[in-house]
Design a protein with these regions (language model features):
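Polar, surface-exposed loop/tail segments
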Residues: 30-31, 61, 93, 102, ...
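Long, internal low-complexity/basic segments
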Residues: 1-5, 16-17, 43, 200, ...
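Active-site regions of oxyanion-processing enzymes, predominantly non-cytosolic
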Residues: 2-9, 112-132, 163-216, 253-262, ...
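C-terminal, low-complexity/hydrophilic appendages and adjacent surface loops
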Residues: 144, 151, 293-294, 361-415, ...
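Catalytic-site neighborhoods of secreted/periplasmic enzymes
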Residues: 60-160, 195-209, 367
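Histidine-centered active-site microenvironments of extracellular/periplasmic hydrolases
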Residues: 28, 114, 251-312, 319
Length: 449
């Protein structure tokens, strides 16, 4: 029987896809990732998140289900204790599992407050082995210095740059690996997410000098948002992630297991830098994400391993929801029989691959979106409180964009004469994808408020 692959999932937070050189970044921000895409992995050039908020995206990745199906539709909801998770499925299949970095699935608004405390074993989603993590990493650390906790709840303090120190823990797992069983290791960083308590992006020292001469993405308009102030440090964070991703690859090679290891690089969502703040409904909140625009939903996704061509740029539209299914498939498991949605990305080259991503919006407004290869169709219920209500029975059309002709999403086709057949097809597809997520609702036609 063929030996099963080890799996390393290197995960960033709030990273735009266009921070990578292979996605158009002109500065030398991601040389290791670019080389990885060029030589070893498949670059999924049209990868989208199904939920652009930190906690819900993480719940989705651990369970292979939409956030509304687990109840984790916004931040500050803990992952239910009985959920079938990646870690539990892989452990049952004989894998050694490890987790490092930001968890963000243990604390809630009841009696469970682990933002700065050790995460109890039962709230780790099945990661019962190697554990070096904090529930809310931005509460226990800053760009330089902080602490996480080990498996036994002992505090592990660090003084250096956070991305380096978190990666140290992942590299240690690889160095100490005995090879008795295949392993799954998730290294979950907070960079390049902003530092909440300081209202800043904390790149390594010298980031503003190194990346001050940046070319802004076309969707970031001059005079809007705060990208002009923060983008150099944001790129500095991404550069640190790149260097540390390279350290992980080097550790796998030094251990002699690189060729036997699937490696995944992805982020939970992108960042619009407060440039699209017209999205917030009453009771809602936004700063850098929480909407359906391309800068928010497009994420980097690169994979090396069995079933993935080296140096391929895959132009098929894919969802982060496909990643858990991909991991289980790599471990020899059947995702569908385990209740995981999505489709293994090993099959993305298939002619019957469905290019449609379903997106749930929370915290800023209660909305749903369908992203196809060419179009984006967005609906919302502005009367719902996006902090207390997860969905609606009746949505109203909000946006329809032709991304081929209007990549910056400035021309809402719903405000003019709309092709009725196109509108019908997109609505039908949206409702079909919603049903797959366990949702049923009606959609009313757009009207100007």
């Amino acid at each position: 029987m063929k030996k099963r692959q080890n799996i390393v999932f290197f995960f960033s937070d709030q990273q735009r896809a266009d921070t990578l050189g292979c996605h158009g970044q002109p500065l030398p921000v991601t040389p290791r990732l670019d080389a990885f895409a060029r030589e070893d992995g498949t670059d999924f050039a049209l990868a989208c998140t199904p939920q652009p908020v930190c906690g819900p995206a993480r719940a989705m990745l651990q369970t292979g289900r939409y956030p509304t199906q687990t109840g984790c539709y916004r931040n500050a909801f803990s992952l239910p204790l009985n959920e079938k998770t990646l870690a539990r499925c892989l452990r049952q299949a004989g894998y050694e599992v490890g987790y490092v970095g930001k968890w963000h699935l243990a604390s809630d608004e009841t009696e469970n407050h682990y933002e700065t405390a050790p995460v109890p074993l039962e709230r780790r989603g099945g990661y019962e082995g190697y554990w070096m993590a904090a529930d809310v990493l931005e509460f226990t650390s800053h760009g330089y210095g902080g602490y996480i906790y080990d498996r036994d709840g002992n505090k592990y303090e660090f003084d250096g740059y956070r991305t380096d120190c978190i990666t140290d823990c992942g590299v240690r797992f690889i160095e100490e690996y005995q090879g008795e069983r295949p392993f799954f290791l998730m290294i979950s960083h907070i960079e390049p997410h902003h530092q909440n308590d300081r209202g800043d992006y904390e790149g390594p020292e010298g980031s503003r000098e190194r990346f001050g001469n940046f070319t802004p993405p076309k969707d970031l308009e001059p005079g809007k948002g705060d990208w002009e102030r923060f983008y150099p440090d944001y790129l500095g964070c991404c550069n640190a992630l790149d260097a540390n991703f390279g350290r992980v690859l080097d550790a796998l090679k030094k251990k002699g297991i690189y060729d036997q290891t699937m490696v995944i690089y992805a982020s939970d969502h992108g960042c619009h830098f407060r440039t699209r703040m017209d999205e917030v409904a009453e009771g809602g909140y936004d700063d850098y994400k929480r909407n359906s625009f391309e800068g928010t939903i497009r994420v980097p996704l690169l994979i090396k391993g069995d079933g993935f061509a080296r140096g391929k740029r895959e132009e098929k539209l894919v969802s982060l929801l496909d990643v858990p299914a991909t991991i289980l498939s790599a471990a020899g498991l059947d995702p569908k029989s385990l209740g995981f949605l999505g489709r293994p990305l090993q099959e993305a080259g298939s002619p019957d691959w469905e290019e449609a991503v379903y997106i749930q919006i929370s915290e800023s407004f209660v909305g749903r979106a369908l992203r196809t290869h060419r179009y984006k169709y967005v609906v919302w219920d502005p009367g719902k409180n996006p902090w207390t209500e997860s969905g609606s029975s009746v949505y109203r059309e909000k946006y329809l964009f032709d991304l081929e002709k209007d990549p910056l999403e400035k021309n809402n086709l719903l405000e003019g004469t709309v092709d009725g057949e196109l509108r019908r097809r997109l609505r039908e597809k949206l409702l079909k994808k919603a049903a797959e997520a366990g949702e049923q609702f009606a959609v009313e036609d757009y009207y100007r408020q």
